[in-house]
């Protein structure tokens, strides 16, 4: 049984044109980690700290479903563009070697099918499921951009060394990317006009076309001591903290009107937001 406790506080960031309408703590009978929201924000996927198993939570009905119990099933699952299906990888050991397959689960009827049989080849589920995406290449020294199936390779920063966390905006007008040594940037899809946004911005994701939601972390050289959800306005470059020091956030996901984040100890929160453009 799922219980939702709401804490509405009407917190407004006028300069960033983003309003936090309410925050809801979603209390589950188990821990929740590594959340992923569906495109329309009605379903959130979650897993265990080690990515074993994958479950879905319907935010309207509070229903939790088991999608898969396999090893690695919770690592970067991908929704279809209509939000009706989820594709994910599971890991098995064959003759002492690790192999991964790709499965597809239908959220409406519960049907599950294997798309790719176990293989040792590297499989990118983003490229398999969607025709529009941005992803760092295997060597992390460039980014592949696919717009409606047309793929180009870009290197947005002349002295960039390693790229991580790249994603095309919802309207397909821009992309963000993180250069591991310097931080988060936003640019045109061809990599031009790269603009610096933040030094520490982990797990970034789009909230509409004007904001990037990310995790700002601090550490003492050994462990994370602070991890806050931040909202970054890509036009003004203003950064607003959305959570406090008492909440050690470990994972997040967002849409244009919702942010879901999980804490280090497995608590899940739903933050309803309003963006005025």
Where does each model-flagged region fall?
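Bacterial N-terminal signal peptides
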Residues: 1-10
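Sequence signature of WD/YWTD-type beta-propeller architectures
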Residues: 15-277
